[in-house]
Amino acid sequence: MSGRGKGGKGLGKGGAKRHRKILRDNIQGITKPAIRRLARRGGVKRISGLIYDETRGVLKLFLESVIRDSVTYTEHAKRKTVTSLDVVYALKRQGRTLYGFGA
C-alpha cells in the first residue's frame, strides 16, 4: 500500500499511456436486423432500404451528444468513471428525462 487511500489520486498520476485500439466504422456494428427490430418495436411494418444508413447516422449523432454531455458531468466531478446518473443528467439537459436510474 502506498498510503494514498482509495482512488489512487495524488503523486505519480501520469503513468505510461496504454495503447488504444483505433476505432473506425463501428457504426456498421448496428446491424440491419437490429435496426429492423427497433422499428418493429416502434410499430413499423415495412422498411425502405435507404433507412438503415440514415438511422445509423442519426443514432451516431444522438449518442455523440449524450456521451459528450455525460463526460462533461464526469470531468466536472473529477471522476474517471461515467456513472448512470451522469447519463441521466445529460439526457435531462437535452429534454429527454429518463426515470428509473436514480435522481
UniProtKB/Swiss-Prot annotation:
Modified residues (N6-methyllysine): K6, K9, K13
Gene3D superfamilies hit by this protein: Histone, subunit A
Matches recorded under PROSITE patterns: HISTONE_H4 (PS00047)
PTM comment text: Glutarylation at Lys-92 (H4K91glu) destabilizes nucleosomes by promoting dissociation of the H2A-H2B dimers from nucleosomes.
Annotated spans, Disordered: 1-20
One annotated GO molecular function: structural constituent of chromatin
Keywords: Acetylation, Chromosome, DNA-binding, Methylation, Nucleosome core, Nucleus
DNA-binding region ranges: 17-21
Residues recorded with modification N6-glutaryllysine: K92
Any one cellular-component term (Gene Ontology): nucleosome
Pfam families xref list: CENP-T_C
Record-listed N6-acetyl-N6-methyllysine modification sites: K6, K13
Highest rank taxon of the organism: Eukaryota
Localization, UniProt: Nucleus; Chromosome
Coiled coil regions, renumbered to chain: none
Comp. bias regions, Gly residues: 1-14
Classification via CDD domains: HFD_H4
GO BP, sorted A to Z: nucleosome assembly
Record InterPro entries: CENP-T/H4_C, Histone-fold, Histone_H4, Histone_H4_CS
Function: Core component of nucleosome. Nucleosomes wrap and compact DNA into chromatin, limiting DNA accessibility to the cellular machineries which require DNA as a template. Histones thereby play a central role in transcription regulation, DNA repair, DNA replication and chromosomal stability. DNA accessibility is regulated via a complex set of post-translational modifications of histones, also called histone code, and nucleosome remodeling.
Subunit structure: The nucleosome is a histone octamer containing two molecules each of H2A, H2B, H3 and H4 assembled in one H3-H4 heterotetramer and two H2A-H2B heterodimers. The octamer wraps approximately 147 bp of DNA.
Entry's family note: Belongs to the histone H4 family.
Protein's recorded name: Histone H4
The organism of origin for this protein: Mycosarcoma maydis (Corn smut fungus)
This protein's encoding gene: HHF1
